[in-house]
Amino acid sequence: MSADNSSLVPSFVVFQVGTRRVALPRDCVAELIASPILFSFPHTTPLITGVVLRRGRIVPVLDLGPGLLGAPSPQARFFLVVERRISNSSERCAIPVQGECELVAGILLPAAGEDDFVTGCLDLNEERIDVLDLEKAIAAGVRSEEQLISAAEALS
């Protein structure tokens, strides 16, 4: 019996948040949904831009823009539904994405940047794509959002 070598190479989902192309490991991505209705409501939770209904469930929408770009992401037509691992349980959330998403196989190279939420990078057709640690990227966004709120309060 021969081993299938393609299963040894990890897969990643490459997507775009604002102007930045990034990737997540394939195993934390559930699906890509197009044009769902985004329901907004008053709240104080950082990064949540609203919720979408998917398969009879309410899925919070988390914007990674503040952590990755320093500003909220532009409005999106597509949402990547991902599994967050929180303690011993998991929860689905949706991330607004711009442009195309693609599934790629590649070797995870060491991280070259300063961002603590980047676990490594992929070399995709001579383009360096950062691979994110989802929980650390969300935490970076929360910190960025809190800094923006503090700065706005200081100005008023």
In which residue ranges do the predicted regions lie?
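An acidic, low-aromatic, low-complexity terminal/linker signal
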Residues: 1-156
